[in-house]
Design a protein with these regions (language model features):
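Acceptor/aglycone-binding surface of glycosyltransferases and processive sugar-polymer synthases
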Residues: 1-69, 94-104
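Hydrophobic helical membrane-anchoring modules
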Residues: 2, 38-43, 64-136
Length: 136
């Protein structure tokens, strides 16, 4: 992927060839809704996958403030990348351990999205007004 010029690669369940295995429909709907909310801010179809690879230069010096487990959202919004690719993968439910999904995580995710949308709007507003955008 890096050889093809991408600065960021995201493993995605929501591109052709990707998917989920052994998930209840309710979890599929929650995941789809979470990604639908994030897409206007990130442009990425599976912003919640948690599997990503990026060039170091994309995030060096970038101030991140992750709330909960979704640090990828911070990088997708604040990172300095020109091109990204989504690579298909099939997610299966864990065999050992406990899921990180709780209602507290849902609240943290929504708080983080609101914060990142504010960041995006602030950068857009600064560019629209003709000033140089603030550094992250």
């Amino acid at each position: 992927i890096v050889q093809r010029g991408a600065d960021l690669a995201v493993a995605s369940r929501h591109v052709p060839g990707g998917g989920v295995k052994d998930w209840p429909k309710s979890r599929e709907y929650i995941s789809a809704f979470a990604n639908l909310l994030a897409q206007p801010c990130t442009g990425i179809h599976d912003a919640t996958s948690g599997f990503f690879l990026m060039r170091r230069s994309m995030v060096e010096g970038v101030a991140v403030n992750p709330i909960g487990f979704k640090i990828g959202l911070e990088f997708y919004v604040k990172g300095r990348y020109r091109r990204y690719e989504e690579v298909p993968y099939v997610f299966t439910d864990r065999r050992h351990g406990k899921s990180k999904f709780t209602w507290r995580e849902v609240v943290n995710y929504l708080r983080q999205l609101v914060s990142l949308m504010g960041y995006r709007l602030g950068r857009w507003w600064t560019r629209w007004r003709g000033a140089s955008p603030a550094r992250s």
